[in-house]
Regions:
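Glycine-rich, flexible loop/turn motifs
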Residues: 2, 38, 53-55, 60, ...
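Short beta-strand-to-loop elements that line the ligand-binding cleft
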Residues: 1-8
Length: 172
């Protein structure tokens, strides 16, 4: 099996349908569109409860210390935005509909449900999810710590930021 970058979701879906590629990973709303178009879904990470990292914040290692204040502010804003999305369904769906060009209420409901089930409120990646990604690259180091630096998130936890978000958005 060869794993390579192939472009955006719509391009990958078209390539699967044409036979140009054999399989691709998609999440909502493309997963629903793929099903509607008769594409066979091999794995659905949500109902199968498979830990996965769908997105991440990537910076050069040196920038973690050199630009720590900027990165901390960025993380705080991203985390609070995630709390808003998880606790204000109407607002989150408006953003999803606009940014992903979703016009179907059913697809919007599925997409939001998928997001809620997969997105940790505090954006902390799980070790299991990172390990599942690393398994795709057996020749690379399988040590999560070689790729994931938790120091900024650990600092936010230690300063009480996560607790403050839980209280503000009444998630605990």
């Amino acid at each position: 099996m060869v794993i390579k970058e192939y472009g955006g979701g719509m391009k990958r879906l078209a390539a699967v349908k044409s036979g140009e590629i054999k399989a691709t990973a998609v999440n909502e709303p493309l997963a629903s569109l793929a099903r509607e178009q008769g594409v066979n879904v091999l794995v659905d990470l949500v109902p199968d409860q498979i830990p996965w990292l769908f997105t991440g914040i990537v910076v050069r290692h040196d920038d973690i210390s050199a630009r720590r204040d900027l990165l901390t502010r960025f993380l705080k804003a991203s985390i609070e935005g995630n709390y808003i999305a998880l606790t204000d369904e109407k607002r989150a769906k408006e953003v999803l509909a606009k940014e992903l060009n979703i016009t179907s209420a059913k697809t919007l409901d599925i997409t939001y449900s998928d997001f809620k089930q997969q997105s940790p409120a505090n954006l902390v990646p799980t070790t299991a999810a990172a390990q599942n990604i690393l398994k795709l690259f057996p020749d690379a180091s399988q040590k999560v710590g070689d790729y994931v630096d938790m120091s900024l998130l650990d600092a936010l936890k230690n300063e009480g930021f996560f607790t403050a978000m839980e209280q503000k958005y009444k998630t605990q």
